[in-house]
Amino acid sequence: MRGRPLKFFFAFILVAVVLSPPAQTGRAQTSEPDEDQRKRLPLRPLYSMPEAFRPEDKPEDADFQPYTDRWRITPPEYEVNVRSSRWDPYNQNILKGDLPILGNDIFLNLSASIDTLVEFRQVPTPCGVSAARPFCEEFFGKPEQLLVNNNVALSADLFKGLTAFKPFDWRFKTTFIGNVNYLRVRENAIVNPDVRRGTTRTDGAAAVQELFAEYKIADLSPNFDFLSIRAGIQPFNSDFRGFIFTDSNLGVRLFGNFESNRSQFNLAYFDRLEKDTNSGLNRFKTRAGGQSVLVANYYRQDFPVLGLTEQVSVQRVAESKSFHFDNNDFLARPDPVGDFNRHSSKAIYFGWTGSGKIDRVNVEHAFYFVKGHDSHNPIAGRDVDIRAYMAALELSYDRDWLRPKVSYFFASGDGNPRDRTARGFDSIFDNPNFVGGGFSFWNRLAVKLTGTGVNLVNRGSLLPDLRSSKEEGQPNFINPGIHIVNFGVDVEVTPTVKLLLNANYLEFVKLETLQLLLFQSKIRKQIGWDLNAGIRYRPFNNNNVIAFFGFATFLPGKGFKDIFESSKPLHIGFTNLTLTF
């Protein structure tokens, strides 16, 4: 009896072992998974299998769906998804580079834009002998002018690569611009030296502003560092704020980066095309006599502190002798002032600039020194050596939706225009975004110097360089120089509206050049106050529709009054609308 329970116990254990399922062994399990498990497992890509083991027929089940490429995966039919259209620039569009047109990595981006400017301005304007009105006894006449300028641009960009961070393998781009402009003034001999042309001018131009090919020579690291070359008509800016050379012109550029994009470099050469006088666009011919520009620069990110990018550069400009009238029949080269003869010049700029943040303070700085030689400066009446410099600094601080800022700009002036050294700073072809940029009265307008054929300051420049024209004239390093002190604030009023307010005080550095040209012994340094405001409006929070509104008032100082014999305030107001597809 005592052995019977023990026999029953061993019999129960034996039956349980025989009837139990096989033990689970985790990752060592070799049995095939059931249907539910198989659906949860990731599918191995077929291309990873050896050629001999590839199945002839693809599996026919719900887990395998062939796609042409990753760009054409059809999204679910949710209400948030918008069906694409070739006329819709906002959503996925094969014509906007969102989808490849060939294979998996060749894209085409077509764009079109209309840019319309309407500008009312007041500029000191001489009243000549053949006046437009009777009873114009005074030297200066009516200052009012109206400018309407319209550009229509068509662009095609074909490239191989990815649309994100990977550099292009190759690229072709072209941009064609058609221009129509209209100018109305109140005095004769402004639109043309022939007074019979009257006080209005309507003109047009067609230009190729971009036409280049780009090719990636080599990948320099697994982190998408690269070396590329670009040849043709191409845009280029030699520094952060456009102080020295900013243009879209004919050239060759070698560029790239290394150290995971912490270092970038450019080596560029330009043989500049002639510019159209009234539109500023490229003409279909090289500059008469020739002007070549060579630029080498190097950028370093997070140096010497995190958030700050520093740049060093060397830029060389060589101008040959030439004789050139602009489209309005005014003499552009050589500058029609002093002892003007055809002359050549060479200058080398050594620059150090920076842009970024130090802690929470935004910092922009620049310093340039230029040296060279001019074979016959018209103001000096002789050959001169060039020695001049420029400095700029902007500090700003972001606090919520406000950015208050303070800026200073300095360009050296020449205190002895008759000696053999030219000490007034001049650029190659500048377009500075500084101390108010295009909203500034001083930066936006060309102010003609009384009784000469040169401008005190040119449109799109801060420098009182006494050139006939920034686009078609020659650099002139005998000039008065300038101090500019700026106080401003940028206000993000709403996500679509930005307000920019600036107050600039301007003063000449040296007066001897102006006194020599104007035969005036008494000219004071104070140029005046430039008060300007601008609004940028983007109704859709993108760049497809952008409207700019600007207004500036110039309060003449004692020096400006000495030159132009008036202390009346001058005004400018403009609106600029850009529509882009």
Where are these regions (language model features)?
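Outer-membrane beta-barrel channel domains
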Residues: 41-43, 55, 60, 91, ...
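Predominantly the C-terminal beta-signal and adjacent terminal strand-loop region
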Residues: 431, 539-581
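Bacterial N-terminal signal peptides
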Residues: 9-21
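C-terminal structural cap/anchor segments
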Residues: 411, 415-526
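Extracytoplasmic loops and strand-loop junctions of Gram-negative outer membrane beta-barrel proteins
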Residues: 93-95, 132-143, 192-197, 234-236, ...
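Short loop/turn motifs that connect adjacent beta-strands in outer-membrane beta-barrel proteins
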Residues: 81-110, 121-125, 159-172, 217-227, ...
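Signature for the C-terminal beta-barrel architecture of outer-membrane proteins
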Residues: 223-226, 234-422, 483-485, 492-493, ...
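N-terminal periplasmic/intermembrane-space "pro-region" immediately following the signal or transit peptide
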Residues: 23-168, 175, 400, 404, ...
